[in-house]
């Protein structure tokens, strides 16, 4: 696990975009320090660094809404990471599926029928529920 290409900021953090691996939907933006990133890669569970608590934050530790990490990507500059995940429940502490549920742009276009999302939903429902 070579993290030498990751450019952590002056506080030792890197932003992490969390994306649903099935739908491509952005679920949240969080931060990871080296320890959180190492734990994520080792356990394949989303782990972050809580800036408010100054401690590791393991997604789902209290809510049960875990995220299985299927891929971790580093951007071209090395200063941002994407966790592609299979979420078990909502990503947001409010109970919303995504933390990005408040529209700032009025009258945003409805994309209507999105075959990729329909396929992902059907595929997910065909799988047996987690034990």
List PLM regions with ranges.
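C-terminal binding/interaction regions
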Residues: 2-13, 19-22, 26-27, 32-131
């Amino acid at each position: 696990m070579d993290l030498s290409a990751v450019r952590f900021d002056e506080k030792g953090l890197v932003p992490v975009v969390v994306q649903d691996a099935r739908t491509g939907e952005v679920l949240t933006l969080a931060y990871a320090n080296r320890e959180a990133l190492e734990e994520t890669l080792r356990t394949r569970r989303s782990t972050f660094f809580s800036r408010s608590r100054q401690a590791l934050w393991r997604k789902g530790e209290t809510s049960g809404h875990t995220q299985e990490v299927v891929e971790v990507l580093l951007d071209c500059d090395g200063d941002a990471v994407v966790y592609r995940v299979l979420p078990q429940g909502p990503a947001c502490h409010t109970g919303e599926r995504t933390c990005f549920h408040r529209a700032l742009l009025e009258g945003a276009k409805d994309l209507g029928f999105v075959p990729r999302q329909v396929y992902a939903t059907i595929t997910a429902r065909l799988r047996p529920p987690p034990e």
